[in-house]
Amino acid sequence: LYSQLAALARRYGAKRLVLFGSRARGDNRYNSDIDLAVYGMPEGSRSNFWMDCEDLPTLLKFDIVHITDGMNPAFLANIEKDGVTLYAAKD
């Protein structure tokens, strides 16, 4: 599943895709959602990315956050602290 998410991030032009929350920390329950932080994805691609994520073969829900300037620094620090990078574009 994570490799499919990375492929979607690449397809839709994200600079970085990070898994965060309980699944990244390893304290998730079987039905915990999948928290994703998306960096640098063009605005016009975001809804298609979300729809394609929802079409992946899982019953789990996705909570997708597109990282933008001006977001809460504490929230961003938590993502960086616990996050697992699933995709990073090569510059």
Describe the residue ranges of each PLM region:
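Catalytic core of pol beta-like nucleotidyltransferases
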Residues: 1-16, 24-30, 39-91
